[in-house]
Structures are given as structure tokens and as C-alpha cells.
């Protein structure tokens, strides 16, 4: 019923008052979802019917393991395209090697290119690494040389975006490592949707606690990573660590966006050289009429200190 109502509704609002109390009994799902297991299958059937009615192609709808009542939709990738992975780099060759190796070793999405954006490195070993990586991946890895000075994350990515040949841009920190092989598929299935702007992923610290699972506003500080430091297996508040959802913003440590959207909002604001460039970008994307999405089904390590 709710799905059919939202198919017709122009706007859905929340009324912050208790309007109804539900009686809980041993035979009710209000006390235990296992009381009526057939409801879980019925819910997936209802979701599949909903997608069919609204004309959204999906490959499957499945229940998320160990979280009955939460479901994963695998949207059909109807707009496949090249993903341009932009990686700003300044020395720290070991981090870059780990990042790039994980991309090529694990990624199952075939159509991508890697653009390493060189930013005033000093170590000879860094440039030897660039040469080696280009020899290993001559068909789809390039090193771009930014002519600016100092560090400006926004300017680096804007420079890389101009050189990118893909329909999708993926901003990626060099201190990350891919965990899930289908990470690009999981991101593209949302980034392809006209309503979607930015797509972010679940990032983990090396100790398998949450580094990023979406950014919220007004919690402890102006903008903060939600569920930061939660253990990786924790479902989060109302299950928010286990299902894809709209969020206000996502980190640019791993952020996918259609190149057309990136260009529409004029890329990252270069006045935000180090911090808040991603938050500002996501806000402008929302103001342009898009929503931002967090998916926990694409996971990477982010070797950032706590």
C-alpha cells in the first residue's frame, strides 16, 4: 500500500507526533519478525511489483543477510559507460601502489580508466612508480601533471576531470584499497539514475571500523561522518549501515558522479583547497535538483588515521 501511495504522491512529509500505538503480541511481527516469515517474501514480491509498475528495470531484489526486513535492490545497469578514476598523488608511493593494484586485481567492471594526477612530488621513487604503472597498464592508465603549486584537492580533481574520457567520474584518494570486486557496479547502478547526483561508499579504517557511511549535518559539528568508528558488522541506527539510502553528502575520498552533473555545477570549488570541498560540492548538487546516495555494498579501506 505504501509503495502504491508513493507512486502517486507528489510530496511525502513526516509528522513528528505519535499518532498511533501498535499492540504487540507473540504472533505479531511487532514482537518478532520471525513470527510471520512469509511477510519477508511478500515484501520482496511487493518491491518487484513496484519497480515493474514504475518502469524501473531491476536484476533482483533480495533480503540483506542477517537483517530481516531490509532489502537490496540490484538495479539493471541500463546506461553503462566508462568510469574515469581520478587519483591525486604526491609521493607516498606505497599507498598509491596498494590503491592501484587493488583496482586492477579486484574490479569486475570492465570499462574504466585510471588517471593519476601528479601534484608536486619530490621523491625519485614516485616517478619510477608512475613509469612502472604505465608499463603495467598501458591501455587505461595515464599520469597527468598538474602545473599548480601547493595542495589544492579541488583544483587537482577539476584538472583531472577535464582530461577524463568517461561518462562517470570517480574521485578517489590514493590511500584507499578496494575490498568488494563489484564496487563500481554498485556505484554505477545509482550514478546512472537521473535523480542521483553523487554516490558514496562504505569506507573502513584498517581495524575494520567505519570511517565513512554518509555525511550528516548538525551532529556534533557542522558536517560529520555518520556511524564513524562503529564496528564493520554493526547494522547501525535503524539499519542504516546495511542498506543503500539517500544522504545529504558523501566524502570525496571515494565519490562517483556523472561527468555531466560535475560540469553542470562547475566541479569542485577551488576556494576549498583541503577540507569541505566535498560537502560544498554535494550541497550544490542537491541545489541543482539531484539527491546523493550512500551504498554499503561498495566497500574500501581508507588508510586515514583516526
Please tell me what each predicted stretch does.
Residues 1-17, 47, 183-187, 241-266, ...:
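A short, conserved alpha-helix in the catalytic core of glycosyltransferases
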Residues 9, 25, 176-221:
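Conserved donor NDP-sugar-binding/catalytic core segment of glycosyltransferases
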Residues 81-86, 113, 280:
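Cell-envelope/extracellular polymer assembly enzymes that use nucleotide-activated donors
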Residues 101-111:
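Short, acidic, metal-binding catalytic loop of nucleotide-sugar glycosyltransferases
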Residues 118-129, 148, 177:
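A conserved acidic beta->alpha catalytic loop
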Residues 130-155, 163:
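Conserved donor nucleotide-binding strand/loop of the catalytic core
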Residues 152-155, 162, 218-260, 264:
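A recurrent flexible, glycine/aromatic-enriched loop bordering the glycosyltransferase active site
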Residues 169:
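Short aromatic/hydrophobic "clamp" motif used to bind/position activated sugar donors
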